[in-house]
A protein has these predicted regions:
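Generic N-terminal amphipathic, Lys/Arg-enriched alpha-helix
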Residues: 1-13
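A polyanion-binding, active-site-adjacent surface
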Residues: 15-160, 168-170, 175, 181-184, ...
Length: 221
């Protein structure tokens, strides 16, 4: 696995690449990609970091692991390439944006436009075996992405961390609430959202209000 990651991130988490766990992780990922179908494509594994340099991050949305069906994963949490049908969680994200901000449902589920505005769409695990959710968990990715979250918390100010569902909410221990806004709710998956607590959480308007309050351009969701 060739680590092609924006240099701004190397300054802050580059030490992770030299640690034994990352060597083991690299060996595991190379073996997986060489012997079975895995997602996202190798060139997109670090897409979230490359589209959103460290000093440009305004918002962090934490996912669990990539979509595991063909043609969906593109290295950005919750995002799918243009032309791909919206997965159920993404449908509910767009419905909440419509409720919260009055914006129409977009034509594409490609969230690159968010990333380019400073939204780090970070899956805790950056790769997955085809058709097997969570298959690459507990091999080292979580240690790496925890380091990224911790670096942002310690070295930046006035970011918005958006945590949907129990897994993402477990990351709040890494975040200094005195320096940042943390927004939490249930996961947007239909199973969780339909029980209540997702719709009308107003995370998108709350996020933008906080950014404006601290002199930042709001996100065009």
């Amino acid at each position: 696995m060739n680590v092609k990651i924006d240099n701004s991130w190397r300054k802050h988490i580059g030490a992770e690449f030299e640690k034994p766990y990352f060597t083991q992780l690299t060996d595991f990922v190379r073996q997986e990609y060489s012997t079975t179908a895995c997602y996202p494509p190798g060139s997109l594994v670090f897409n979230a970091f490359n589209l959103c340099p460290f000093d440009a991050v305004k918002v962090v949305i934490i996912g669990q692991d990539p979509y595991h069906e063909p043609g969906q994963a593109q290295g950005l949490s919750f995002s799918v390439p243009a032309g791909v049908p919206f997965p159920p969680s993404l449908q509910n994200i767009f419905k909440e944006i419509q409720l919260d901000l009055g914006k129409p449902i977009p034509q594409t589920g490609d969230l690159t436009r968010w990333a380019e505005q400073g939204v780090l769409l970070l899956n805790a695990t950056l790769t997955v075996r085809a058709h097997q959710a969570a298959s690459h968990q507990r091999h080292g990715w979580e240690q790496f992405t925890d380091a990224a979250i911790s670096a942002l918390s310690a070295e930046r100010e006035h970011l918005v961390f958006i945590l949907w569902g129990g897994y993402a909410r477990s990351k709040k221990q890494l975040i200094d609430r005195g320096r940042h806004l943390v927004l939490e709710s249930v996961h947007p998956s239909p199973l969780s959202a339909n029980r209540g607590g997702w719709f009308s959480n107003h995370h998108f308007s709350l996020c933008n209000a906080y950014l404006r309050e601290h002199g930042e351009q709001e996100i065009d969701w």
